[in-house]
UniProtKB/Swiss-Prot annotation:
Organism: Mus musculus
Keywords for the protein's UniProt record, in alphabetical order: DNA-binding, Nucleus, Transcription, Transcription regulation
Major subcellular site: nucleus
GO molecular function, one term: RNA polymerase II cis-regulatory region sequence-specific DNA binding
Bias kind Basic and acidic residues: ranges: 185-195
Free-text function comment from the UniProt entry: Transcriptional activator that may play a role in regulating epithelial cell differentiation and proliferation. May act as a repressor for a specific subset of ETS/AP-1-responsive genes, and as a modulator of the nuclear response to mitogen-activated protein kinase signaling cascades. Binds to DNA sequences containing the consensus nucleotide core sequence GGAA. Involved in regulation of TNFRSF10B/DR5 expression through Ets-binding sequences on the TNFRSF10B/DR5 promoter.
Domain notes: The PNT domain acts as a transcriptional activator.
PANTHER family: ETS, ETS HOMOLOGOUS FACTOR
Protein name per UniProt: ETS homologous factor
Domain PNT: 29-115
Gene Ontology BP term (one): epithelial cell differentiation
Amino acid sequence: MILEGSGVMNLNPANNLLHQQPAWTDSYPTCNVSSGFFGSQWHEIHPQYWTKYQVWEWLQHLLDTNQLDASCIPFQEFDISGEHLCSMSLQEFTRAAGSAGQLLYSNLQHLKWNGQCSSDLFQSAHNVIVKTEQTDPSIMNTWKEENYLYDPSYGSTVDLLDSKTFCRAQISMTTSSHLPVAESPDMKKEQDHPVKSHTKKHNPRGTHLWEFIRDILLSPDKNPGLIKWEDRSEGIFRFLKSEAVAQLWGKKKNNSSMTYEKLSRAMRYYYKREILERVDGRRLVYKFGKNARGWRENEN
């Protein structure tokens, strides 16, 4: 892959990518490019140096911030490194992710050339809006007539039987604010003095479903009788009050119609990412996978 400003490829390990940082690393002034190989968060380093896990974290971030259904982005199509990801064209993103491909491609291009270490700065500069077509009753009626599941608490369609149709209907990009023509003084000031990211081993108020489950297990005094450890050393746990957990998650996500059936369906999304595992033959029993963090007793 040819990088801007690089005329000769140097194969000497002593002068490799850790010493020859391309021009786009200027957008990450407080970041150590090499730290991508040692567990740093995805927004702290340039996408070129993401691990496969950091690619997945980026995809999860887009799902969460844009309130997309998990089926909109097929994670199995992105079991790749950051270098591979950065080499993909818009057409390749579209083939891999369908209607979500444009969102992923546009988001990645912004990160590559205008990225900041702080995810908050990134979100303010790159405004991706996902909206529903609820203003057109005929569209909503068509979805209902075709037996798609409609969740009024979200004001949008969720858990559609045809996820591809759902994603095509849901994803709407705002292009006017993606790449500003001229930088304002405030934006320039933010780029010159980026907000430092303070990372922790785990966030006690995790925004992901698996983190929410983990945090209940880690705080049994605050959430008694909901979930219990079956084998803490192996990361195995059981739902005691599955519907109560679902209602708590629904409250967190402003979805009053959340049920355990929907919750368990969302949990399956973490299987391929090896964050959660289903324990065969045991109802309501799950296990944290090798990519889940913050649940072990010896983790700080």
